[in-house]
A protein has these predicted regions:
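Conserved N-terminal beta1-alpha1 strand-loop-helix module at the mouth
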Residues: 1-99, 118, 174-175, 196-213
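Solvent-exposed alpha-helices and their adjacent loops that cap or buttress functional pockets
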Residues: 12-15, 74, 138, 159-160, ...
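Aromatic/hydrophobic pocket-lining residues that form π-stacking "cages" and hydrophobic walls in ligand
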Residues: 43, 112-113, 132, 155
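Short, solvent-exposed amphipathic alpha-helical segments in soluble enzyme
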Residues: 45-47, 160-161, 182-185
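Catalytic cores of alpha/beta
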Residues: 88-98, 131-140, 154-156, 172-190
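Glycine-rich phosphate-binding active-site loops on the catalytic face of alpha/beta enzymes
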Residues: 102-112, 146-154, 184-207
């Protein structure tokens, strides 16, 4: 298992060894119901024991999110913990405050990227248009998420960008890893297909067990 990244360069190491990120979208009941919250934490603990640490939490603009993610950071210091659906400066500030190692944008926002860079916080842009991809590269982005990837797989030919690490996202499951790895993506983001109704897809555990054998 790789230790949680201590700098941006370490993120590249994680991409080379771990082919997916699990996106958790907390429901209001996770914030307010300790039983549900404990169940999710048990699932995360099982993932860590299986050698998986790439968890990102969808950002919400409320105090409950801050408390929840801060608690995860304290309970699971080994997690490579990130925030997702980043859309404004407050979401960056909240991510830094809670100890997130990185964040991912849903779309492209040049000003937000510059703001995150000024805070020395790793923000991975979401790209769906070629013009946005070119802007991201001009700003020296070395890790870029293509979202939604199924709509853009033919529009964005990632093979021509040799020095960029691409992450695929949008409606993907653990079974999609071989396809997107073959297309040149370093990793994929698994959202609702991997975490739904506060439960992690059993196929993810199966995949992790096969990898460890």
């Amino acid at each position: 298992m790789i230790s949680p990244l201590k700098n941006k360069d370490s993120f590249h190491e994680i991409l080379n060894s771990e082919p997916f990120f699990l996106l958790v979208k907390p429901t209001q009941s996770i914030y307010t119901n300790s039983i549900e919250s404990d169940l999710v934490e048990q699932e995360i603990e099982l993932l860590i024991k299986a050698g998986f640490i790439n968890i990102e939490i969808s950002w919400s603009n409320n105090e409950n999110w801050l408390n929840y993610v801060s608690n995860l950071r304290l309970k699971f210091p080994k997690l490579n913990l990130g925030s997702a659906s980043i859309r404004n400066k407050k979401s960056i500030d909240d991510s830094i405050k809670t100890g997130c190692n990185y964040s991912m944008m849903r779309g492209w926002d040049r000003d937000l990227l510059n703001y995150s860079n000024s805070k020395n916080h790793l923000l991975i842009p979401g790209i769906k248009h070629l013009k946005d991809l070119k802007q991201a590269i001009e700003l020296n982005c070395k890790i870029i998420k293509v979202y939604p990837v199924k709509d853009n797989i033919e529009l964005i030919n990632i093979s021509q960008y040799k020095n960029i690490n691409f992450i695929a996202a949008g409606g993907l499951s653990i079974s999609d890893i071989p396809l997107y790895k073959s297309l040149g993506y370093k990793a994929i983001v698994i959202g609702d297909m991997g975490f739904k109704n506060n439960k992690i897809d059993p196929k993810i555990y199966e995949w992790l067990r096969r990898r460890s054998n």
